[in-house]
Amino acid sequence: MEQVIQFEDVVKIYPLKAGDVTALNHISFSVERGEFISIMGPSGSGKSTLLALMGCLDTPTSGSISMSGRAIRNMSDEELTSFRRDKIGFIFQYFNLFPLLNIIENVSFPQMLRGGVNEEKAREVLRAVQLDERLFTHTPLELSGGQQQRVAVARALINDPDILLCDEPTGNLDSKTGASIMELMTELNRKGATIIVVTHDPGVAKYTNRTIRIVDGCIAS
């Protein structure tokens, strides 16, 4: 199987006035194309740092990270920006939608960053996440939390990313709506999407095929 993410002996240290903080301590693991993985651990364990590194939003203090076979240390800032924009889809706990844009415009925003908008593609991914077409011209504040998260998932899919990175995607939803979002993720994974979910909720982790547990910056299992 093709490895889309590979961490080798990765260390991340944050220098602070009170002393250095080691967020990740010699982490090694890989993710194969088509996997559905949860990352679990207590608050402060290093989950968010790990997600930032996987999303090419930060760089390690030491060790090696490869994304789709390319070592990120060999990429320029421009190449990293392009890779993040074109190959990674992000889904957040608080949706991060633009309140003054309608749903089509929100979903199309990553395309705008690439220099062009395909409205039909936006409609296609919104249908894929099962959002009612009557809502496509509404603004986010006119939608429920579950509907807004479906829009966020559609936005993450618009550029056909290799990897979906999800930070507590159900954390701001009730249990029933959260379950519907995870069922949607499961369906996307069945269609071939590689999905990584950071969560503290065992109920979310049960939808995934593998769990990586982080404790004190180290992989526990």
List the predicted regions and their residue ranges.
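Conserved ABC ATPase "signature" region
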Residues: R70-A71, V117-R134
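Catalytic Walker B motif of ABC-type/P-loop ATPase nucleotide-binding domains
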Residues: L164-D167
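Hydrophobic anchor residue at the start of the ABC signature
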Residues: V153
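Conserved ABC transporter NBD signature motif
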Residues: G63-A71
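Conserved catalytic motifs of ABC-family nucleotide-binding domains
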Residues: D160
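Conserved ABC ATPase signature
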Residues: T139-L143, Q147-Q149
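Short coil-to-helix segment of the ABC ATPase nucleotide-binding domain corresponding to the Q-loop/switch region
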Residues: L101-S108
